[in-house]
Amino acid sequence: MTAEEDSNSTGRFPEADSRDVPEPAARQEAEPAAGPDPEARPQDDARAEADRTRSSVGRRALLGWGGAGLALGAVAAGGTATALHNDEADADPASAGQAVPFHGTHQAGISTAVPDRLHFAAFDVTTEDRDELIQLLKDWTTAAARMTAGHAVGDGAFGPVPESPPDDTGEASGLKPSRLTLTVGFGPSLFDKDRFGLAEQRPEALVELPAFPGDKLEKARSGGDLCVQACADDPQVAVHAIRNLARIAFGKAAIRWSQLGFGKTSSTTPDAQTPRNMFGFKDGTRNVSGSDEKALDEHVWVAEKDGPAWLAGGSYLVARRIRMHIETWDRTSLKEQEEIFGRDKREGAPVGKAKEHDEPFLKAMLPTSHVRLAHPDAHNGARILRRGYSFTDGTDGLGRLDAGLFFLAYQRDVRRGFIPIQRSLARHDALNEYIQHVGSALFAVPPGVRGKDDWWGRELFS
């Protein structure tokens, strides 16, 4: 699967375009205003010493820092949330206009505007204790709410107790929120073997993705119990977020694989210029719009009637690492490239049309063209919301670029979305000669966090 002209393209790789105007998060509720923050990038006045010491001790205990942390286990039990929370209600709003609201009906990072950079991480849960997993999700939620607002985790990177590790790693200190969004999902393996008493809560649509023709999946780049998608305009802000969530997870979960991305390959903002993928073609021309509530309800959000109840308002995320054979593509004639995609390379217009957004005449295209095969008309109207990014990870042993598309797509049901679309593309798409799927994962993405007492996955564990 590769790049598609439509909402359904399961394999494309556009370049970044920072001209997107930040749109209001679709159906996201505004974050309550906050007061002074202990470290809202940059650092503010310190708090009372007793408060700081209690928070620092709780943080050390959470991360398992040596004998002192273990000896103070009783304090840690009540101190962890304090260290991470840091009175969010008392924090100043950071960089107005660059922070995306964290709380809302749906998680940010799905229908909200797409920032320029990505750091995606899949985690294996290493603890066998259900309560520890719940506490991890609570701590992640608290930290995520702070970071997306432009604040540091806990007491920040510069104190208050020099003899203990700081709560925040510090590389984002002084930086703006950069439209950071953090989106969490649960993989099929989290429900396997009833590890945490969740087997009966596994959604029917959270299936193992089938093997598709041409797949060459690497186990080290596939699967995961949990995932976190961090998107931001500043790559350092996105990396900082994943780094700190991984740090909080120490002893409970560990990163299984991760991927950095640049040059968003699709936009959810209708008036934004369509980005180009690494094959040089405009990508995501007909992507689902983040402001089209009817389309989102029909194709992206899980409805109450779909079940299970804990997932209503959430979605399903497919992640695919698609390597592009750049050198082979670059030796292909322009005429053949355009026939493969079914679009003009300069304007992005469908074959036989003049403008990018003209309705394509599918019969004018080759039966194996990417646009024709991925079009909703070929799949009973099925659409997916694509949010992928390009990647480059150096070169292989033969000096060929390890580059391509990190494909991300949200949908209401993968059995009616990604799976039939990709099955058709994998069998017939002429673009398959130039791409290889090497990584794959599927996650159920819970609904948004609706208030300070809510947390990622609360209804799943209730």
Predicted feature residues:
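N-terminal secretory signal peptides
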Residues: M1-V57
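Long, histidine/aromatic-enriched segments associated with O2/redox biology
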Residues: A3-E4, S56, A61-T82, N86-S462
